[in-house]
């Protein structure tokens, strides 16, 4: 089965697992997914993740979700740039999520980073998703 939007699939798995109160969730592994998870961990939205190998030899990422007093830390997780409609923004046009309370994750020539890091590095790129 082919997957048209692997990053969107990972975000949906995280949303669904948090709605069910799960402590961890697994998703197929890729570099882009790992880079996005690095940003989520640095911003404090997840506890962390580790790469595991299944019995079939496939690599998966096991994500440890974060809760505060029983409620998920991630309230809103949305894909912005989709395979059918890519969204790009310059350093000055990067969107602010909830007046700066949330984070946009951006794929730049210098790597995947948060909107604040991209603004300070003065680089723009593809706006992958927003987190609040």
Curated annotation (Swiss-Prot):
One GO term (biological process): translation
A Pfam family of this chain: Ribosomal_S8
Gene Ontology cellular component annotations, sorted alphabetically: ribonucleoprotein complex; ribosome
PROSITE patterns: RIBOSOMAL_S8
Keywords associated with the record: Ribonucleoprotein, Ribosomal protein, RNA-binding, rRNA-binding
Superkingdom of the organism of origin: Bacteria
InterPro entries, per the entry: Ribosomal_uS8, Ribosomal_uS8_CS, Ribosomal_uS8_sf
Molecular function, one GO term: rRNA binding
Assembly and binders: Part of the 30S ribosomal subunit. Contacts proteins S5 and S12.
Family: Belongs to the universal ribosomal protein uS8 family.
Function: One of the primary rRNA binding proteins, it binds directly to 16S rRNA central domain where it helps coordinate assembly of the platform of the 30S subunit.
Protein name in UniProt: Small ribosomal subunit protein uS8
Native source organism of the sequence: Paracoccus denitrificans (strain Pd 1222)
